[in-house]
Amino acid sequence: MPIHNTSIIHSNSLIEENAIIGKNCKIGPFCYVSSDCVLEDNIELFSHVSIVGKTLIGKNTKVWPFASIGHYPQDLKYKGENTELIIGTYNKIRESVSINPGTKGGGGTTKIGNNC
């Protein structure tokens, strides 16, 4: 499991085997990060955060409780195509936010810029 040795992961969180966790990340209790996710350096996940799918979160981003990131698109035309979610650096994702990957009709990628 490529988790940088400076990162701190709460014992009640689940990080799947191929997930990549950068330097100085803090992952609070009851978080889930699936195998295709990349968290760059200095990411902080507060409790109860779920990150799945082909998702990249840029450095120095904070994610507050109950955020749901990278789950299947809500577009009813989605049929399991390869999609991704890219979140830039220095972002603040607040409580109970849902951010989904793109759909085939929109190019398959959702991108969020920096400092949002």
Where are these regions (language model features)?
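Short, flexible, glycine-rich and Lys/Arg-enriched loop motifs at helix boundaries
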Residues: 72-82, 105
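A structural motif detector for beta-strand N-caps
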Residues: 1, 7, 13, 19, ...
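Internal nucleotide-binding/catalytic subdomain
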Residues: 99, 105-107
